[in-house]
Amino acid sequence: MERILVIYYTQSGQLKQIADNFVAPFVGAGIPVDYYEIEMETPFPFPWNNEAFFGAFPESFLQLPQLIKSVPESIMEREYSLVALAYQVWYLSPSIPITSFLKSEQVSHLLSGKPVVTLSGTRNMWIKAQEKIAEMLKKHNAPIVANVALTDRHHNHISVLTIVHWLFTGKKDRYLSIFPKAGVSEKDIASASLYGEMVLKQMQTGIYTPDLQKEIVAQGGVRIKPFLLSAEKKANRLFGIWARLIYGSPHRKFLLKCFHAYLYLAIWILMPIVWLFYWITYPLFYKKISRQVVNAQQSAVSSQ
């Protein structure tokens, strides 16, 4: 008998909404769906405070696991036909709870040989995190058969303001009554059911083909802005330098304050300059950039 497992970690509830919509077609087809919510032994706060938010950076980027509560026996004892892994992105890497689960002792027993669909709901940068997820799943022989990456579609700097308001107040409302709501739009969250239908059709055939991801991309399930693709690659390298510098340092608190200042400088001063230079040179690299976008949309997906 077919059975689906949803593995997720969410703070605001947005990812749970995405996952619920994704599995709705399976539920409608009479296929049982189980949920496993990853729980930390020491929970992260939400809303965040400044110290906790920036303090999570080194361990998050370096993918250092922390203690999580054991997967319930009722989940471990069942066989699943498909796993939906819904994850947050923290600092261009999978969130610490997701990393902790994927590096836990129980994960191989639960995921080995199981096809996986990855679901994410982010501000706008998720590609590097997806690559890191794929690397961890590969070690457990769990192929990614589809990827749905929903993002905040508003302008980069507008989404910075709105996401900060959401993260530090816990309120997903219109900041200052002027800006749009933060996060993935309600319309896009609801659209996850469409991608669920696509996956369901292939699951029923028993074969997942590369055409599945192409269909998801064609229907808007993976949107990539070319400039942010380039910016994310550069940011990933710089984050690596900062994370290794801060982790284990006796001057951790001071260095985290420096990193905070660096982020402010990078987002509000350096990024607009880089953006201008990028678009000036864009015509020269159009074909290369187009290939990179297509590759990223298909990234980390393997057929069975």
Residue spans of the language-model regions?
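Short, conserved secondary-structure transition motifs
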Residues: 41-43, 122-126, 152-156
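Helix-loop-strand module that forms the ligand-binding subsite of alpha/beta enzymes
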Residues: 48-144, 148-149, 273
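N-terminal beta1-alpha1-beta2 submodule of the flavodoxin-like/Rossmannoid cofactor-binding fold
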Residues: 1-83, 87, 92, 199-302
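Conserved beta-strand termini and adjacent loop/short-helix elements that scaffold enzyme active sites
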Residues: 36-38, 147-150
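Short, intrinsically disordered terminal tails adjacent to the first/last structured region
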Residues: 126, 301-304
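Glycine-rich phosphate/pyrophosphate-binding loop and the adjoining helix
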Residues: 155-231
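Charged catalytic carboxylate motif
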Residues: 14, 97, 191
